Amino acid sequence: MKESLVNKLNKLKKSFLIKENLSKSFNLIYLKISEIIFLKKVLLGKPLIIGLAGGQGSGKTTFAHFLKLILENKYNLKTAAISIDDIYKTKKERFRISKKINKLFITRGVPGTHDVKFLNIFFKILKNNKFNKSYLIPKFDKSIDDRLPKSKWHHLQKKVDIFIL
């Protein structure tokens, strides 16, 4: 038997160690935003890129995971979600830039430390619906302050309807 959306959401809630009752905010925020995204996708008929903004620790990753779960299970939309942290340049690249421009570039988070070129190429592929092969997206590990090996990157094997960043 297929697991219910409510059960999946409760499991996800536990995985993020959320103790608060989400019923009120869930109905007002998560479901409504998911519905708006679904309707926008239907109207446009092409993949959507959803960007989440907020300070460190504000809940962007948690929000993205809840949206992904709802969009996939309630609306049957193929959804991918990654963190903006995953797009940081490698430690080696940041070190090289820090030697040329400014020592602050060694620290992730400084403007210019994200791989914007990669994102632009990926978004063009997604926008033009030319997603005809599997695609690797970097995965960053803050504990080592660097990208993980390619074997551990996000592996998108399908066209996506919604991409959350």
Which residues does each predicted region cover?
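Charged, amphipathic alpha-helical linker segments immediately N-terminal to NTP-binding catalytic cores
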Residues: 1-29
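Conserved nucleotide-sensing/catalytic segment adjacent to the nucleotide-binding pocket
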Residues: 17-21, 80, 87-144
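Pre-Walker A adenine-sensing motif
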Residues: 31-43
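Short hydrophobic/aromatic beta-strand immediately N-terminal to the Walker A/P-loop
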Residues: 49-54
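Walker A (P-loop) phosphate-binding loop of P-loop NTPases
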Residues: 57
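Conserved lysine of the Walker
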Residues: 60
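Hydrophobic positions on the alpha1 helix immediately C-terminal to the Walker A/P-loop
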Residues: 63, 67
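Post-Walker A helix-loop "phosphate-sensing" segment adjacent to the P-loop in P-loop NTPases
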Residues: 69-80
